[in-house]
Protein backbone atom coordinates (compact mmCIF):
# COMPACT_ATOMS: atom_id res chain seq x y z
CA UNK A 1 0.00 0.00 0.00
CA UNK A 2 1.24 3.52 -0.70
CA UNK A 3 1.73 6.32 1.78
CA UNK A 4 -1.52 8.35 2.21
CA UNK A 5 -0.20 11.35 0.20
CA UNK A 6 0.70 9.07 -2.74
CA UNK A 7 -2.54 9.44 -4.77
CA UNK A 8 -2.16 13.21 -4.83
CA UNK A 9 1.56 13.02 -5.59
CA UNK A 10 0.94 10.59 -8.45
CA UNK A 11 -1.75 12.86 -9.89
CA UNK A 12 0.64 15.83 -9.77
CA UNK A 13 3.50 13.86 -11.29
CA UNK A 14 1.31 12.48 -14.09
CA UNK A 15 0.12 16.02 -14.85
CA UNK A 16 3.73 17.24 -14.96
CA UNK A 17 4.80 14.35 -17.23
CA UNK A 18 1.95 15.12 -19.63
CA UNK A 19 3.01 18.77 -19.65
CA UNK A 20 6.63 17.85 -20.42
CA UNK A 21 5.49 15.63 -23.30
CA UNK A 22 3.37 18.45 -24.69
CA UNK A 23 0.02 16.65 -24.40
CA UNK A 24 -1.36 18.24 -21.24
CA UNK A 25 -4.00 20.19 -23.18
CA UNK A 26 -5.30 16.89 -24.58
CA UNK A 27 -5.52 15.20 -21.20
CA UNK A 28 -7.65 15.28 -18.07
CA UNK A 29 -6.26 14.31 -14.67
CA UNK A 30 -8.67 13.78 -11.79
CA UNK A 31 -8.51 12.33 -8.28
CA UNK A 32 -11.44 10.32 -6.90
CA UNK A 33 -11.22 9.45 -3.22
CA UNK A 34 -13.33 7.88 -0.50
CA UNK A 35 -12.49 10.75 1.89
CA UNK A 36 -14.41 14.02 1.57
CA UNK A 37 -11.17 16.01 1.21
CA UNK A 38 -7.49 15.27 0.53
CA UNK A 39 -5.75 13.93 3.65
CA UNK A 40 -8.85 14.76 5.67
CA UNK A 41 -7.38 13.16 8.79
CA UNK A 42 -4.63 15.78 8.87
CA UNK A 43 -7.08 18.66 9.20
CA UNK A 44 -8.16 21.62 7.05
CA UNK A 45 -4.76 23.33 6.78
CA UNK A 46 -3.03 20.42 5.04
CA UNK A 47 -6.16 19.45 3.12
CA UNK A 48 -6.67 23.00 1.87
CA UNK A 49 -3.08 23.37 0.71
CA UNK A 50 -3.21 20.07 -1.22
CA UNK A 51 -6.45 21.18 -2.88
CA UNK A 52 -4.83 24.49 -3.77
CA UNK A 53 -1.87 22.77 -5.43
CA UNK A 54 -4.11 20.34 -7.33
CA UNK A 55 -6.29 23.22 -8.53
CA UNK A 56 -3.24 25.18 -9.71
CA UNK A 57 -2.32 22.19 -11.87
CA UNK A 58 -5.83 21.82 -13.29
CA UNK A 59 -6.51 18.58 -11.37
CA UNK A 60 -10.06 18.10 -10.10
CA UNK A 61 -10.73 16.36 -6.79
CA UNK A 62 -13.90 14.31 -6.23
CA UNK A 63 -14.47 13.27 -2.63
CA UNK A 64 -16.79 10.70 -1.12
CA UNK A 65 -16.29 8.37 -4.09
CA UNK A 66 -16.71 4.75 -2.95
CA UNK A 67 -16.10 2.39 -5.91
CA UNK A 68 -18.31 -0.69 -6.08
CA UNK A 69 -18.02 -1.90 -9.68
CA UNK A 70 -15.41 -1.95 -12.46
CA UNK A 71 -16.63 -2.75 -15.98
CA UNK A 72 -16.19 -1.56 -19.56
CA UNK A 73 -13.61 1.11 -18.83
CA UNK A 74 -15.79 2.66 -16.14
CA UNK A 75 -15.81 2.76 -12.36
CA UNK A 76 -19.16 3.04 -10.63
CA UNK A 77 -19.51 4.55 -7.17
CA UNK A 78 -21.94 3.58 -4.44
CA UNK A 79 -23.80 6.89 -4.86
CA UNK A 80 -24.33 6.30 -8.60
CA UNK A 81 -21.49 8.42 -9.98
CA UNK A 82 -19.46 6.96 -12.85
CA UNK A 83 -15.85 7.51 -13.86
CA UNK A 84 -14.68 6.84 -17.42
CA UNK A 85 -10.95 6.50 -17.92
CA UNK A 86 -8.15 5.68 -20.34
CA UNK A 87 -5.67 5.04 -17.52
CA UNK A 88 -6.78 4.13 -14.00
CA UNK A 89 -4.37 4.10 -11.06
CA UNK A 90 -6.21 2.39 -8.22
CA UNK A 91 -5.23 2.26 -4.55
CA UNK A 92 -6.73 -0.66 -2.59
CA UNK A 93 -8.09 -0.02 0.91
CA UNK A 94 -5.74 -0.69 3.79
CA UNK A 95 -6.20 -4.13 5.33
CA UNK A 96 -4.27 -6.22 7.85
CA UNK A 97 -1.63 -8.57 6.47
CA UNK A 98 -3.02 -12.11 6.17
CA UNK A 99 -0.10 -13.63 8.06
CA UNK A 100 -0.77 -11.30 10.99
CA UNK A 101 -4.55 -11.48 10.66
CA UNK A 102 -4.46 -15.24 11.10
CA UNK A 103 -1.94 -15.16 13.96
CA UNK A 104 -2.49 -14.97 17.75
CA UNK A 105 -1.35 -11.33 17.58
CA UNK A 106 -4.53 -10.24 15.82
CA UNK A 107 -7.40 -8.45 17.49
CA UNK A 108 -11.09 -8.42 16.44
CA UNK A 109 -10.39 -6.26 13.34
CA UNK A 110 -7.46 -8.36 12.19
CA UNK A 111 -4.78 -5.84 13.14
CA UNK A 112 -2.40 -6.68 16.00
CA UNK A 113 -3.32 -5.44 19.46
CA UNK A 114 -0.50 -3.38 20.99
CA UNK A 115 0.05 -0.83 23.72
CA UNK A 116 -0.55 2.51 22.00
CA UNK A 117 2.45 4.16 23.66
CA UNK A 118 5.04 1.38 23.41
CA UNK A 119 3.84 -0.79 20.45
CA UNK A 120 4.40 -3.86 22.64
CA UNK A 121 1.97 -6.77 22.38
CA UNK A 122 0.10 -7.23 25.69
CA UNK A 123 -0.23 -10.97 25.05
CA UNK A 124 3.36 -11.44 23.90
CA UNK A 125 5.56 -8.95 25.84
CA UNK A 126 8.64 -9.74 23.75
CA UNK A 127 6.85 -8.84 20.51
CA UNK A 128 6.59 -5.29 19.12
CA UNK A 129 4.55 -4.32 16.07
CA UNK A 130 5.19 -1.15 14.05
CA UNK A 131 4.53 0.40 10.64
CA UNK A 132 1.77 -0.46 8.19
CA UNK A 133 1.11 -3.72 10.04
CA UNK A 134 -0.51 -1.86 12.94
CA UNK A 135 -0.66 1.91 12.31
CA UNK A 136 -4.10 2.01 10.61
CA UNK A 137 -5.59 0.49 13.78
CA UNK A 138 -3.83 3.13 15.89
CA UNK A 139 -5.12 5.95 13.65
CA UNK A 140 -1.53 6.69 12.66
CA UNK A 141 -0.69 7.18 8.97
CA UNK A 142 0.79 4.09 7.29
CA UNK A 143 3.79 6.12 6.19
CA UNK A 144 7.48 5.30 6.00
CA UNK A 145 8.50 8.24 8.16
CA UNK A 146 6.29 7.02 11.04
CA UNK A 147 7.61 3.46 10.77
CA UNK A 148 11.18 4.82 10.72
CA UNK A 149 10.77 6.61 14.04
CA UNK A 150 8.84 3.69 15.52
CA UNK A 151 11.70 1.38 14.56
CA UNK A 152 14.28 3.59 16.26
CA UNK A 153 12.13 3.80 19.38
CA UNK A 154 11.47 0.05 19.61
CA UNK A 155 15.16 -0.71 19.02
CA UNK A 156 15.96 1.48 22.03
CA UNK A 157 13.35 -0.26 24.17
CA UNK A 158 14.69 -3.71 23.24
CA UNK A 159 18.25 -2.60 24.05
CA UNK A 160 17.00 -1.26 27.38
CA UNK A 161 15.30 -4.56 28.17
CA UNK A 162 18.47 -6.49 27.40
CA UNK A 163 20.72 -4.20 29.44
CA UNK A 164 18.26 -3.72 32.27
CA UNK A 165 18.51 0.07 32.12
CA UNK A 166 16.78 2.82 30.18
CA UNK A 167 19.06 3.90 27.33
CA UNK A 168 16.60 4.98 24.65
CA UNK A 169 14.51 8.04 23.88
CA UNK A 170 10.74 8.24 24.34
CA UNK A 171 8.77 7.80 21.13
CA UNK A 172 8.46 11.09 19.29
CA UNK A 173 5.00 11.13 17.67
CA UNK A 174 5.93 13.83 15.15
CA UNK A 175 6.19 13.14 11.43
CA UNK A 176 7.01 15.16 8.36
CA UNK A 177 7.56 14.20 4.75
CA UNK A 178 7.83 16.04 1.46
CA UNK A 179 4.92 15.58 -0.93
CA UNK A 180 6.27 15.64 -4.50
CA UNK A 181 3.83 16.92 -7.15
CA UNK A 182 6.31 16.77 -10.03
CA UNK A 183 7.17 20.45 -10.38
CA UNK A 184 6.17 21.56 -6.90
CA UNK A 185 6.31 20.15 -3.39
CA UNK A 186 4.74 20.53 0.04
CA UNK A 187 6.28 19.83 3.45
CA UNK A 188 3.60 19.10 6.08
CA UNK A 189 4.28 18.28 9.71
CA UNK A 190 1.97 16.51 12.16
CA UNK A 191 2.16 15.73 15.87
CA UNK A 192 0.27 12.56 16.81
CA UNK A 193 0.53 12.72 20.60
CA UNK A 194 -3.23 13.30 20.99
CA UNK A 195 -3.94 10.42 18.61
CA UNK A 196 -1.81 7.99 20.60
CA UNK A 197 -3.33 9.22 23.86
CA UNK A 198 -6.81 8.79 22.40
CA UNK A 199 -7.74 12.39 23.15
CA UNK A 200 -8.13 13.94 19.71
CA UNK A 201 -6.97 14.57 16.17
CA UNK A 202 -3.36 15.23 15.14
CA UNK A 203 -2.01 18.76 15.17
CA UNK A 204 -0.79 19.53 11.64
CA UNK A 205 0.64 22.47 9.75
CA UNK A 206 2.50 23.42 6.58
CA UNK A 207 6.22 24.00 7.07
CA UNK A 208 7.05 24.94 3.48
CA UNK A 209 5.80 24.78 -0.10
CA UNK A 210 7.54 25.46 -3.40
CA UNK A 211 9.89 24.15 -6.05
CA UNK A 212 12.88 24.42 -3.71
CA UNK A 213 11.19 21.94 -1.36
CA UNK A 214 11.23 19.37 -4.17
CA UNK A 215 14.92 20.05 -4.78
CA UNK A 216 15.52 19.45 -1.07
CA UNK A 217 13.75 16.10 -1.33
CA UNK A 218 15.88 15.08 -4.32
CA UNK A 219 19.08 15.97 -2.45
CA UNK A 220 17.96 14.09 0.67
CA UNK A 221 16.98 11.07 -1.43
CA UNK A 222 20.44 10.97 -2.99
CA UNK A 223 22.09 11.28 0.44
CA UNK A 224 19.86 8.55 1.90
CA UNK A 225 20.68 5.97 -0.74
CA UNK A 226 24.37 6.92 -0.79
CA UNK A 227 24.69 6.31 2.95
CA UNK A 228 22.24 3.41 3.27
CA UNK A 229 24.92 0.70 3.23
Regions found by a protein language model. Give the residues of each.
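A Rossmann-like FAD-binding core segment of flavoenzymes
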Residues: 16-113, 165-166
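C-terminal auxiliary extensions adjacent to catalytic cores
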Residues: 188-229
Amino acid sequence: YPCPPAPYEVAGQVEFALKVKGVRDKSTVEVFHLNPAPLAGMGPVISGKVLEILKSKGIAFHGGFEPVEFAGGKVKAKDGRELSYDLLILTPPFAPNRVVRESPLAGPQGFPEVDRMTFRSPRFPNVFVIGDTVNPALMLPPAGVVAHFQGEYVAGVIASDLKGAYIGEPFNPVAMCIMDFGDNALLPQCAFDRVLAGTGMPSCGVMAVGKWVRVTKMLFEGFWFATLI
